[in-house]
């Protein structure tokens, strides 16, 4: 943990507040990550996790939290940190190896010049992120096999998942999000996202507290995905206007009612018949719905029962 310096004229109580807040944040992060791991059975006995570390705040936090949980988890598992050096201009090659070595973490740096490929294929002025991501994914799948990893851990957080949901809804005309656990495209690997319940602002605060050596994600000079950027701003505006809204939306991802949507593949609308029996979950379209009341101070996630994966102390 980073040291807390007491400035002249600052009382002991005032000086202790940053440490108190950092401890609260640490407990919350470890609880939410532990809850996600337990809810989706992300880590099993004997697993070897390949933790993908890009040098951004999210992947640093993921590795940091997993290392802590490894010491107190109810099962044994190992991990190896992997970074893909895509030979972007001015990429500080020394930063991640030095950091990972200082943490005593087994790591592997994969050197692949995908930057040149993307620059050659993508027209000038167009975003390179999509092709870059596909190339990176294929390489990481290969590396996972070579390292004998049983799971691939990625640093996507709650806000990433909500952004993906709305991106697919607004621009893809489908209800599809970003799952916390899935089988890879090639069918050979299980991919997990232990930060699925963690809001981005907590990761920003944790990165500042832990003073991670952040590597900027704009080295390639590519423009950020404009659609995702717009969605992210929309979600931030909603949360500012209605605190707790993002928590509720995140909880809704795990509380789907197919009978009240329109997908005939998920619910037998065409063969539906009256049964003569009352249905507590039936149509309440004309009723006042208590679930539409403003959220309380505590989110659904915060109020969830603890599980044995949760960080202690």
From Swiss-Prot:
Enzyme Commission no: 2.8.1.-
Enzyme class: transferase
GO cellular component: cytoplasm
Pathway: tRNA modification
Catalysed reaction equations from the record: cytidine(32) in tRNA + S-sulfanyl-L-cysteinyl-[cysteine desulfurase] + AH2 + ATP = 2-thiocytidine(32) in tRNA + L-cysteinyl-[cysteine desulfurase] + A + AMP + diphosphate + H(+)
Subcellular location: Cytoplasm
Example GO BP: tRNA thio-modification
Binding positions for [4Fe-4S] cluster per the UniProt entry: 129, 132, 220
Similarity annotation: Belongs to the TtcA family.
Protein name: tRNA-cytidine(32) 2-sulfurtransferase
Species lineage: Bacteria, Pseudomonadati, Pseudomonadota, Betaproteobacteria, Burkholderiales
């Amino acid at each position: 943990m980073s040291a807390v310096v007491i400035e002249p004229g600052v009382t002991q109580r005032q000086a202790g507040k940053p440490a108190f807040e950092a401890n609260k944040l640490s407990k919350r992060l470890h609880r939410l990550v532990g809850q996600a791991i337990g809810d989706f059975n992300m880590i099993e006995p004997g697993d070897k996790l390949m933790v993908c570390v890009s040098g951004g705040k999210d992947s640093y936090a993921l590795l940091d939290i997993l290392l802590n949980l490894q010491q107190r988890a109810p099962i044994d598992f190992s991990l190896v940190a992997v970074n893909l050096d895509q030979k972007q201009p001015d990429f500080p090659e020394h930063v991640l190896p030095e950091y990972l070595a200082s943490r005593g973490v087994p790591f592997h740096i994969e050197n692949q010049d995908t930057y040149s490929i993307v620059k050659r294929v993508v027209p000038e002025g167009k975003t390179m992120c999509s092709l870059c991501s596909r190339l990176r994914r294929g390489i990481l799948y290969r590396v996972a096999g070579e390292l004998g990893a049983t799971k691939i851990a990625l640093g996507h957080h709650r806000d990433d998942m909500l952004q993906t949901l709305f991106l697919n809804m607004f621009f893809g005309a489908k209800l599809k999000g970003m799952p916390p656990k899935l089988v890879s495209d090639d069918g050979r690997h299980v991919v997990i996202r232990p930060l699925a319940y963690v809001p981005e602002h907590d990761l920003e605060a944790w990165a500042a507290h832990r003073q991670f050596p952040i590597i900027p994600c704009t080295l390639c000079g590519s423009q950020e995905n404009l659609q995702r950027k717009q969605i992210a701003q929309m979600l931030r505006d909603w949360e500012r206007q209605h605190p707790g809204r993002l928590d509720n939306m995140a909880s809704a991802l795990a509380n789907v009612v197919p009978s009240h949507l329109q997908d005939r593949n998920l619910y037998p609308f065409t063969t539906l018949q009256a049964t003569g029996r009352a249905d507590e979950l039936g149509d309440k379209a004309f009723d006042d719905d208590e679930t539409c009341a403003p959220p309380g101070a505590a989110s659904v996630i915060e109020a969830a029962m603890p599980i044995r994966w949760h960080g202690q102390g």
